[in-house]
Amino acid sequence: MQFSTVASIAAVAAVASAAANVTTATVSQESTTLVTITSCEDHVCSETVSPALVSTATVTVDDVITQYTTWCPLTTEAPKNGTSTAAPVTSTEAPKNTTSAAPTHSVTSYTGAAAKALPAAGALLAGAAALLL
């Protein structure tokens, strides 16, 4: 009688833990904006405008939603200081290519595998207990 009580409790615990699935969802959409970068040197500051990639992450912990936004400036080639001699270049005119940015959407999700396997383990334990009775 005592062993069947333990097996019943194990089966109930396995079913209850199956309800605690963990799901993670990721949504991506590329977005750019212009940012102003201020650089200071020797008490003299200068501002430059640069395109930047905008990233936003939303994190929910214990029903508290926190949103993080970052702006990552995209690299641009700046002229290097110093002297240089350019090699002669011969070129032919190539057709102009134009590109336009389009938003990219992707969604992925993951459900915790351990939460799915635990009820099966509880059922196996309950079945083994029933065989031993």
Curated annotation (Swiss-Prot):
Membrane topology: Lipid-anchor; GPI-anchor
GO cellular component terms given for this protein: cell periphery; cellular bud tip; extracellular region; fungal-type cell wall; fungal-type vacuole; mating projection tip; side of membrane
InterPro entries documented for this protein: Flocculin_t3_rpt (IPR025928)
Pfam families in UniProt: Flocculin_t3 (PF13928)
Record location of the Glycyl lysine isopeptide (Lys-Gly) (interchain with G-Cter in ubiquitin) cross-link: K80
Signal peptide residue numbers: 1-18
Free-text description of this protein's post-translational modifications in UniProt: Extensively O-glycosylated; glycans consist probably of single mannose residues. N-glycosylated. The GPI-anchor is attached to the protein in the endoplasmic reticulum and serves to target the protein to the cell surface. There, the glucosamine-inositol phospholipid moiety is cleaved off and the GPI-modified mannoprotein is covalently attached via its lipidless GPI glycan remnant to the 1,6-beta-glucan of the outer cell wall layer.
Lipidation sites (GPI-anchor amidated glycine): G112
UniProt-annotated location(s): Secreted, Cell wall; Membrane
Keywords, in A-Z order: Cell wall, Cell wall biogenesis/degradation, Glycoprotein, GPI-anchor, Isopeptide bond, Lipoprotein, Membrane, Repeat, Secreted, Signal, Ubl conjugation
Ranges of Polar residues composition bias in the record: 81-104
Glycosylation sites: 21, 23-24, 26, 28, 31-33, 36, 38-39, 46, 48, 81, 97
Recorded GO MF terms: structural constituent of cell wall
First and last residues of every Sequence repeat: 75-88, 91-103
Residue span(s) of the pro-peptide: 113-133
Any one GO BP annotation for this protein: agglutination involved in conjugation with cellular fusion
Region described as Disordered: spans on this chain: 79-104
Function summary: Component of the cell wall. May play a role in the formation of a tightly packed outer mannan layer, which protects the inner glucan.
Other observations noted: Present with 158000 molecules/cell in log phase SD medium.
Family: To yeast protein YDR134C.
Name used for this protein in its record: Covalently-linked cell wall protein 12
Source organism per UniProt: Saccharomyces cerevisiae (strain ATCC 204508 / S288c) (Baker's yeast)
